[in-house]
């Protein structure tokens, strides 16, 4: 189960990294990439799967440093902000910038979480 958690964790980091690049292109170059919203929901879905597997591992007494759990749960904030704040923004350019900033924050958090998990697996 730990290996699956690590694989999906890496996929989550990759998905949010790609999403950050896509939203950066949308925000700063004006590119219209219609599939960005689908990618956003797919990345969030991977993160949800990570939480389910992570709580399963936590329930089975798998040892991990508390900072791993704290940072992992912190990633909910920028993901939620992207889906809530950016989606309600009427100015497209501002919505894309907000999504980019939220995705960048998520990527940085997830890289830290993944690295902690990698070192303590």
Label the predicted regions.
Residues 1-17, 118:
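Hydrophobic transmembrane alpha-helical segments in integral membrane proteins
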Residues 11-29:
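N-terminal signal-anchor/start-transfer transmembrane helix
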Residues 27-38, 87-95:
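Membrane-interface helix-boundary motifs at transmembrane edges
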Residues 53-81:
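Short alpha-helical packing/oligomerization segments
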Residues 108-121:
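Juxtamembrane boundary at the C-terminal end of a transmembrane helix
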